[in-house]
Amino acid sequence: MFTVFLLVVLATTVVSFPSDRESDGANDEARTDEPEEHGPDRNGCCRNPACESHRCG
């Protein structure tokens, strides 16, 4: 009976460890180093279609 208990504890411990496989990004924090899409860029142009001011083509 004790052997079965140890086997269950070991199995749940192994399952609970994070895998070394590549992540799909679901748990990653939002990146802040990318440029803001809804504000004017360094030329003063807004690339967002919903932006009414500072449109540059």
Curated annotation (Swiss-Prot):
Sites bearing Cysteine amide, chain numbering: 56
Q: Report the family membership.
A: Belongs to the conotoxin A superfamily.
Disulfide cysteine pairs (residue numbers): 45-51, 46-56
Q: Where is this region: Disordered?
A: 17-46
The places in or outside the cell where this protein is found are: Secreted
Q: What is known of its domains?
A: The cysteine framework is I (CC-C-C). Alpha3/5 pattern.
**Signal sequence bounds:** 1-16
- Function, as annotated: Alpha-conotoxins act on postsynaptic membranes, they bind to the nicotinic acetylcholine receptors (nAChR) and thus inhibit them.
Keywords in alphabetical order? Acetylcholine receptor inhibiting toxin, Amidation, Disulfide bond, Neurotoxin, Postsynaptic neurotoxin, Secreted, Signal, Toxin
Q: Please list the residue ranges that the record marks as compositionally biased, kind Basic and acidic residues.
A: 19-41
Under the cellular component aspect of Gene Ontology, which terms does the record hold? extracellular region; host cell postsynaptic membrane
Tell me what this protein is called. Alpha-conotoxin-like Sm1.2
Question: Which residues form the pro-region?
Answer: 17-42
